[in-house]
Amino acid sequence: MTTATMDLKQHIRGIPDFPKPGILFYDISTLMRNADAWQVAMGRLTHAVAPWAPDMLAAIESRGFLTAAPLASNLGCGLVMLRKPGKLPGETVSHTYDLEYGSDTLHIQADAIRPGQRVVVMDDLLATGGTLAASVALLRKVGADVVGASVLVELRALGGRQRLDVPVQALISYDD
């Protein structure tokens, strides 16, 4: 199979009832373990994100780090981390957002983004869109021009894309 025709869905396994009953977890570790498939995935993501001409990629803790690091290298741009409380040194800016049951908070180092820098936010998966929407809001708080969001996997049935006011590139989509 050539890289152009490789079906990356074949390298992602679904694990039922994880992390709790009724959830089908899409495990990207099987994609990462296959060097050829991982290189194809990173090449396709690079090709998808390049037209946005980002100055910086913003990676959401923790699986967003896995895709953002190789893409930043491929694109020749910087990388910043969006992390949970207490994980970043120095002064941080935070954004708290609601979850189905409770809330969560993301932080960015206060000096990580220069106002007006073009930023693409990256995560492994887009489901309901709550974390990506919060990340976009946080990045705008520090002056970023958020030009897009990129994920490995999108679960279209959950409608997360509709919560975002930036273009979204998903490498793999599941409709159910």
From Swiss-Prot:
Chief location of this protein within or outside the cell: cytoplasm
Keyword Transcription regulation in annotation: no
One Gene Ontology CC term in the entry: cytoplasm
Keywords, comma-separated and alphabetical: Cytoplasm, Glycosyltransferase, Purine salvage, Transferase
PROSITE patterns from the UniProt entry: PUR_PYR_PR_TRANSFER
Keyword Cytoplasm included in the entry's annotation: yes
Xref: NCBIfam families: apt, PRK02304.1-3, PRK02304.1-5
Record-given protein name: Adenine phosphoribosyltransferase
Organism, scientific name: Gluconacetobacter diazotrophicus (strain ATCC 49037 / DSM 5601 / CCUG 37298 / CIP 103539 / LMG 7603 / PAl5)
Origin organism lineage: Bacteria, Pseudomonadati, Pseudomonadota, Alphaproteobacteria, Acetobacterales
Protein encoded by which gene: apt
